[in-house]
């Protein structure tokens, strides 16, 4: 029998109704296209009684009571603050929250205010707790992955459980698990994580074709594919595919240590590889050329299609050769490839030509270029990309696909491409295609195309300006600052991207013999205010200066001049978000050396300025980082030890920097090798090994040598003093002879 409606109950229902109406109006105002989070009286989410394509119905899991909602909200705050007296008390608190959440997992996951708590609990959960959550979600995954908040909980659960699968491959023992915490009657054998993932896939099977384009489920599906494939989950490319840019980052203290098992490449069972292959087949089964083109241009479908294509090209390469009759996704996109690509009117050629200039579709072309088999890429390059490479690099959209092409070209094809592009380099500079120029310089350096580097460098200088200083000021966007802006926000966003690309180009040039000299001359020619702006504008711009300090120069005064220009602003840079990296980099430059050095007296002056502003430095984490790296406390209390430490740093850097290696050491290393033919290769390896494996031994050896020299010097001084005393006591005749000899 239902309880009679009381006055208090009626008031509570009225409050809930008002909250629902407020949430609906807020959501409608914020974004009309967003699905509503509130519930209607019929038990389904408002406006979502059925799927958009008419398949299936949305489930409603109920709402938490006000007291429960308040408890979980408070628990979320406590976890975020992490102010527990000890780890034991924190573990007890987590256990209590899990007990309170029992049988409420679905409500928590689909709650706007409590889904964050569920994500944090998943990040800190044990293997048994993850498996309980899989069982709690079982049978409802199709609805959960399409829910605005629950989909994030599913993603977190899949990501954090990936490492458990790999761990269980080495040997899984199914312990008896009390899933309900109700005693011996409710105990049952613990399921393997592999089986739980496969059961989840069984629920989603049959719905994959429309989940690909779902606003929330598409992200969850990508996460599931990455877990099944065994790919690293922390890669930047993987993160871009998995998460929306707008997604809130939910983190909790202790999650990184718990997530250690999920990092890097993971071994996966054969069933996962088969499941990933089946998802690829089922997702695009029955799609014709038109459907694939629509999917390739879809904002949600394109990233999923990218991942499907990449996995299709990388998984089971050997099996694809044996099963050539089966149409893969690659040949669905490019029918008849590679032969059909020679015909400009073929379906495959039209697909490439239509997608490469599309803002969304071009991303699929990038994936295709990167992972296509050699025969297909060769046909693409010879028939489509190489003949039109000059036009592709000039376009804002197709230039990204052109960069992927340049990264795969052989030396001969690269030289041919550079010959086409070289006359338009000044135009590329004007259009701010700095990322294209960076790729050209890097690939020419990697392929040993030195003549092409000279041509590109000449065109770059023509495009930037006549004076040496123009190279840095133009590429970093410090010219024409007074130009009026129409859309301030959009322009500032675009300008930041252009500035980053320009700074990355300068950083790349500093590692290439030839262009490095031009960048160093430009840095010497700019005003000190420009150097300060480089140090404080962004991470890419300050990286230009830190890389310049780490790079040897034929000009002995280069590093000294840069530091001298920055000296009046040292304390300001030390407390700046980006500038403190530069101050830390100065400490690593040796005090002596022909190619790279900052005099010791200049380092003392820097430390003195930092000491004057010690209180200011200690007020910020950037300043504390600088004070710690420069050993400010040692400088205050033990000045002599600080000087010894700084000289030790110099000696350590001198012996471990390959680019500054002393000629004597190189000759000795070469003499120790048995064969002259192997000298250059082995010599390089020895220098790298010295950096990685033997710094401590060298440091001990240098200390011992210094100690021996000091002892010898002291003995010699004592001997000289003794001789002088003996001479004074000697006969007058001998003293006269000594005086005559001195005259």
UniProtKB/Swiss-Prot annotation:
Keyword annotations from UniProtKB, A to Z: Nucleus, Repeat, Ribosome biogenesis, rRNA processing
UniProt source species: Fusarium vanettenii (strain ATCC MYA-4622 / CBS 123669 / FGSC 9596 / NRRL 45880 / 77-13-4) (Fusarium solani subsp. pisi)
Basic residues: bias regions: 1-19, 701-730
Chief localization: nucleus
Region feature (Disordered): 1-56, 656-743
UniProt keyword rRNA processing, yes or no: yes
GO cellular component labels: 90S preribosome; nucleolus; preribosome, small subunit precursor
Residue spans of biased composition, Basic and acidic residues class: 20-40, 673-685, 691-700
Role according to the record: RNA-binding nucleolar protein required for pre-rRNA processing. Involved in production of 18S rRNA and assembly of small ribosomal subunit.
Pfam families reported for this sequence: PUF_NOP9
Lineage, opening ranks: Eukaryota, Fungi, Dikarya, Ascomycota, Pezizomycotina
Protein name, UniProt field: Nucleolar protein 9
Gene behind the chain: NOP9
Listed GO biological process terms: endonucleolytic cleavage in 5'-ETS of tricistronic rRNA transcript (SSU-rRNA, 5.8S rRNA, LSU-rRNA); endonucleolytic cleavage in ITS1 to separate SSU-rRNA from 5.8S rRNA and LSU-rRNA from tricistronic rRNA transcript (SSU-rRNA, 5.8S rRNA, LSU-rRNA); endonucleolytic cleavage to generate mature 5'-end of SSU-rRNA from (SSU-rRNA, 5.8S rRNA, LSU-rRNA); ribosomal small subunit export from nucleus
Similarity annotation: Belongs to the NOP9 family.
InterPro entries: ARM-like (IPR011989), ARM-type_fold (IPR016024), NOP9 (IPR040000), Pumilio_RNA-bd_rpt (IPR001313)
Compartments it resides in: Nucleus, Nucleolus
Repeat (Pumilio) residue spans along the chain: 100-135, 203-243, 347-382, 565-608
Molecular function GO terms recorded: RNA binding
Xref: SMART domains: Pumilio
Keyword rRNA processing carried by entry: yes
């Amino acid at each position: 029998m239902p309880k009679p409606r009381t006055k208090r109950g009626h008031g509570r229902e009225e409050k809930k109704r008002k909250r629902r109406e407020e949430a609906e109006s807020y959501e409608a105002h914020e974004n009309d296209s967003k699905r509503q989070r509130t519930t209607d009286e019929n038990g389904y989410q408002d406006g979502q009684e059925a799927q958009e394509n008419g398949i299936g119905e949305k489930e409603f899991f109920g709402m938490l009571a006000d007291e429960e909602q308040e408890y979980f909200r408070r628990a979320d705050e406590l976890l975020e603050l992490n102010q527990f007296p000890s780890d034991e008390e924190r573990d007890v608190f987590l256990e209590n929250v899990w007990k309170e959440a029992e049988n409420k997992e679905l409500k928590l996951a689909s709650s706007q205010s409590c889904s964050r708590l569920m994500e944090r609990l998943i990040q800190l959960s044990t293997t048994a707790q993850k498996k309980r959550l899989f069982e709690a979600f079982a049978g409802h995954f199709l609805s959960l992955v399409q829910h605005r908040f629950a989909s994030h909980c599913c993603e977190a659960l899949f990501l954090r459980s990936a490492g458990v699968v790999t761990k269980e491959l080495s040997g899984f023992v199914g312990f008896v698990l009390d899933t309900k915490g109700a005693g011996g009657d409710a105990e049952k054998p613990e399921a393997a994580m592999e089986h739980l993932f496969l059961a989840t896939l069984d629920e989603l099977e049959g719905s994959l074709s429309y989940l690909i384009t779902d606003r929330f489920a598409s992200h969850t599906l990508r996460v599931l594919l990455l877990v099944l494939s065994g790919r690293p989950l922390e890669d930047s490319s993987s993160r871009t595919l998995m998460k929306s840019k707008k997604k809130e980052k939910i983190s909790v203290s202790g999650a990184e240590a718990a997530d250690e098992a999920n990092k890097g490449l993971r071994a996966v069972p054969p069933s996962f590889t088969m499941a990933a292959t089946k998802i690829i087949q089922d997702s695009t089964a029955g799609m014709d050329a038109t459907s694939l083109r629509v999917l390739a241009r879809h904002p949600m479908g394109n990233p999923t299609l990218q991942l499907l294509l990449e996995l299709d090209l990388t998984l089971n390469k050997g099996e694809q050769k044996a099963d050539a009759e089966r149409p893969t996704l690659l040949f669905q996109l490019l029918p008849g490839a590679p032969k059909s690509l020679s015909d400009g009117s073929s379906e495959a050629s039209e697909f490439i030509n239509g997608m490469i200039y599309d803002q969304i579709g071009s991303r699929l072309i990038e994936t295709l270029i990167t992972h296509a088999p050699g025969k297909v890429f060769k046909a693409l390059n010879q028939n489509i990309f190489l003949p039109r490479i000059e036009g592709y690099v000039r376009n804002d959209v197709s230039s990204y696909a052109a960069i992927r092409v340049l990264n795969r070209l052989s030396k001969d094809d690269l030289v041919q491409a550079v010959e086409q592009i070289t006359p338009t380099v000044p135009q590329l500079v004007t259009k701010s295609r700095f990322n294209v120029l960076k790729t050209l310089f890097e690939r020419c350096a990697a392929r040993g195309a030195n003549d092409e580097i000279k041509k590109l460098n000449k065109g770059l200088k023509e495009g930037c300006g006549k004076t040496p200083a123009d190279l840095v000021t133009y590429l970093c966007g410090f010219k024409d600052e007074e130009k009026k802006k129409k859309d301030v926000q959009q322009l500032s966003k675009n300008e930041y991207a252009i500035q980053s690309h320009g700074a990355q180009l300068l950083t790349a040039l500093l590692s290439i013999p030839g262009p490095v000299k031009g960048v160093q001359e430009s840095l010497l020619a700019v005003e000190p205010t420009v150097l300060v702006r480089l140090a404080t504008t962004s991470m890419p711009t300050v990286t230009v200066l830190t890389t310049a300090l780490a790079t040897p120069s034929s000009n002995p005064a280069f590093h000294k001049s840069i530091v001298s220009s920055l000296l009046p602003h040292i304390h300001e840079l030390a407390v700046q978000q980006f500038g403190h990296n530069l101050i830390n980099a100065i400490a690593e430059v040796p005090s002596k050396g022909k190619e790279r050095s900052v005099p010791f007296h200049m380092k003392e002056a820097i430390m003195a300025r930092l000491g004057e502003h010690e209180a200011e430095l200690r007020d910020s984490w950037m300043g504390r980082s600088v004070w710690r790296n420069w050993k400010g406390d040692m400088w205050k209390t033990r000045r002599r030890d600080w000087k010894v430490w700084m000289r030790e740093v110099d000696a350590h850097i001198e012996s471990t920097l390959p680019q500054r290696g002393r000629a004597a050491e190189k000759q000795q290393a070469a003499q120790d090798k048995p064969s002259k033919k192997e000298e250059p290769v082995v010599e390089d390896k020895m220098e790298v090994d010295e950096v990685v494996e033997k710094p401590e031994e060298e440091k001990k050896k240098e200390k011992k040598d210094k100690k021996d020299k000091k002892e010898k010097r002291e003995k010699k001084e004592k001997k000289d003093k003794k001789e002088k005393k003996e001479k004074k006591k000697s006969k007058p005749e001998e003293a006269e002879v000594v005086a005559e000899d001195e005259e």
